[in-house]
């Protein structure tokens, strides 16, 4: 899959191929349809967030469609349209 990857603070991120996510029993895989860039992305880009380690996949406000569900997921189905709240940082 493609991702916006920051390799060095205060430089443009690159769009790169990265490994597809692995769907664990308590997770879902979402095909991204839209992703916002916000102030916390700017802080990450500046190097002002001590939790950001490089390389860093940018963007965490997204909407998409579920393409795979884990074995323990009962509330969602493949094909559901979803938004993802900012609870965990990017690239996890």
Predicted regions, residues:
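Cytochrome P450 core scaffold surrounding the K-helix E-X-X-R motif
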Residues: 40-46
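Residue-level signal for short segments within beta-strands and strand-turn junctions
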Residues: 5-7, 46, 66
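Residues located in well-ordered beta-strands
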Residues: 2, 14-17, 31, 65
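Short N-terminal binding/cap micro-motifs at the start of the first secondary-structure element
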Residues: 11-15, 39-40
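Glycine-rich beta-strand-centered segment in the early N-terminal region that forms part
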Residues: 21-35, 48-92
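A short beta-strand micro-motif
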Residues: 3-6, 82
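Active-site donor-binding loop signature of nucleotide-sugar glycosyltransferases
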Residues: 8, 20
């Amino acid at each position: 899959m493609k991702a916006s990857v920051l390799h060095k603070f205060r430089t443009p991120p690159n769009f790169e191929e990265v490994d597809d996510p692995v769907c664990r029993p308590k997770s879902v895989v979402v095909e991204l349809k839209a992703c916002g860039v916000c102030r916390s992305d700017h802080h990450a880009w500046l190097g002002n967030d001590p939790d950001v380690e490089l390389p860093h996949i940018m963007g965490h406000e997204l909407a998409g469609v579920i393409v795979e569900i884990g074995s323990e997921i009962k509330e969602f189905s493949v094909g559901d349209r979803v938004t993802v709240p900012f609870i965990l940082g990017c690239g996890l």
